[in-house]
Amino acid sequence: MVGVLLFLAYTAQTYGLKDTTPGKNAFLTAVYCVLVPFVNWALLRRRPSRWNWLAAVMCLGGIGLVSLDGSLSMNRGDALTLLGGVCYALHLVAVSRFGEEDDPVLLTAVQFGASALCCWGCSLAIETMPATLPQGAWGELIYLAVFATTLALLMQNVGQSVTPAAPAAILLSLESVFGVLFSVVCYGETVTPRLAMGFLLIFLAVVASETHFSFLRRGKSSVDKGAPA
């Protein structure tokens, strides 16, 4: 089940990227961080905190600024990307649930194996297999499989094992920021003031949901303690 959810998330995000920009794809995918507490509420009866509700409102506002046009409609790419975000949220909750009982390395291997089988099955069913791959395709496949997927998740798991939760959440939330940065540099995406405001709202929503801005309160407490009497 966990592998199938990962397959659905990857597929929706990838197909969404065909009809939207990389920057919008990165930020709309990041909404899974905000959705996780509500998926936990629906499936595991763990009520969201007031910070989660605030993050949800901010995130909805950000999605509206990023995705909705003047007719309040959403294009296919943005809709598929949001669906991918929902699947990532379901996947994260499932991993948290089963990861408590299973070896994380084995669980990761099973996820990738199941996801790969689903991808192969769907490609055989709906795609025409080429006799030869285009020049440069092997390099792209190796980059996506090794660096963008396996190595990225491995470094994330290792980093989270030695980093406190709040700083780790902030660092992970920067994924969407780097997505926009590389989209501007490599893809030539134009970030309008409306898009920038939407990106900022989604980013703040992710940080609020993941950290409750606890790092700000700790910083203020340290300053107060260091102040002369």
Task: Tell me what each language-model feature is.
Residues M1-T29, L65, A145-T163:
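Specific transmembrane alpha-helical segments of multi-pass solute transporters/efflux pumps
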Residues Y15-D19, G64-R76, S123-L141, V184-P193:
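Membrane-interface helix termini and inter-helical loops of multi-pass transporters
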